[in-house]
């Protein structure tokens, strides 16, 4: 059986790691041991931050919606509750985009949410806690 020399494989693996470490500072970009550790850590950060990006964008959309809704005299929580009661299913990303680019359409959504909240307030639905608390 022929002898297998691993120089080509090792060189290819090292080259792959060093290519991923391009742009790093100091010895992390050209020393295989430090580059490998830095690349591993960067992949961990990338994995974690792909999850965090979703949270960050949702928080941004909520802040934008809240700011736009407060101009209309409502809070974010009441607005979302009103939309649910009105049967309007629009996600927060689209609501945020509508609030920024189409204020008239957003005002109509706020009006329908207010109307749904007022309608439910005026109906005589028995409170579940009335009999329990004395």
UniProtKB/Swiss-Prot annotation:
> Member of which family?
Belongs to the bacterial ribosomal protein bL20 family.
InterPro entries tied to this protein:
Ribosomal_bL20, RIBOSOMAL_L20_CS, Ribosomal_protein_bL20_C
Q: Encoded by which gene?
A: rplT
Tell me a GO biological process for this protein: translation
> What keywords were assigned to this record?
Ribonucleoprotein, Ribosomal protein, RNA-binding, rRNA-binding
Q: Known Gene3D superfamilies for this protein?
A: 6.10.160.10, Ribosomal protein L20
Task: Give the superkingdom in one word.
Answer: Bacteria
Q: What does this protein do?
A: Binds directly to 23S ribosomal RNA and is necessary for the in vitro assembly process of the 50S ribosomal subunit. It is not involved in the protein synthesizing functions of that subunit.
Q: Which CDD domains match?
A: Ribosomal_L20 (cd07026)
Q: Tell me which NCBIfam families the record gives.
A: rplT_bact (TIGR01032)
**MF (Gene Ontology):** rRNA binding; structural constituent of ribosome
| Listed PANTHER family | 39S RIBOSOMAL PROTEIN L20 (PTHR10986)
Q: Name one Pfam family in it.
A: Ribosomal_L20
Q: Name one GO cellular component term.
A: ribonucleoprotein complex
- Output this protein's name: Large ribosomal subunit protein bL20
């Amino acid at each position: 059986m022929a002898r297998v020399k691993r120089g080509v494989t090792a060189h290819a693996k090292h080259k792959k790691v060093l290519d991923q470490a391009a742009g790093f500072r100091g010895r992390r970009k050209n020393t295989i041991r430090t580059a490998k550790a830095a690349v591993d850590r960067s992949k961990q950060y990338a994995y974690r931050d792909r999850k965090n990006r979703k949270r960050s964008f949702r928080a941004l959309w909520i802040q934008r919606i809240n700011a736009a809704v407060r101009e209309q005299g409502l809070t974010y929580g009441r607005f979302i509750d009103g939309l649910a009661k009105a049967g309007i299913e629009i996600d927060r990303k689209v609501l945020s985009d509508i609030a920024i680019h189409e204020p008239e359409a957003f005002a109509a959504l706020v009006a329908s949410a207010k109307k749904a909240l007022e309608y439910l307030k005026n109906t005589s639905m028995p409170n579940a806690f009335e009999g329990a608390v004395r």
